[in-house]
Amino acid sequence: MISTEFIKNHLRKILSIRLRVKLGLALRHRAKGYAHLNGFGLEIGALHNPAQLKNSCTVEYADAINKSEAMHIFPEVNPKDLVDVQYIIDLDKTGLMALKNTHYDFVIMNHVIEHVANPIDVLAELFRVVKKVVML
């Protein structure tokens, strides 16, 4: 089992990156990719900085912790900014087993895959839950 301290440290690193994104200091190329997305999707690891998508997109959220845990771990983040997580997942242990095959039109993971033990397994799970792959 992953310790709370590990999750805290891991998420603090992600938080630092996301704050830079929010302030416009990080990569801006994501918007070009997001412009191609439509339909029903899944975003993994959004925390308080979900992808800015078109109105034609509907998104469910998955993360290692729920909103109330995130509020406790990150008191510096405005709770209103935290996404409501529909799926609590551990990509290293169970992958996306809780999700149906070919259920989503797209999946977004920003700054997540580099933190998993076996990225190839995670990619296989992503291919399983999307209807068709158009872009990585």
Language-model segment annotations:
Residues 104-108:
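Hydrophobic beta-strand segment of the Class I
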Residues 35-96:
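Class I SAM-dependent methyltransferase SAM/SAH-binding core
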Residues 54, 117, 131:
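Short conserved AdoMet
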Residues 1-35:
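Membrane-proximal basic amphipathic "stem/tether" segments
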Residues 120-134:
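A short glycine-rich, Lys/Arg-flanked "PGG" loop and its adjoining helix->strand segment in the class I
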Residues 36, 102-103:
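Alpha-helix C-terminal capping/helix-to-coil transition sites in glycosyltransferase folds
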Residues 111-115:
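A short His-aromatic
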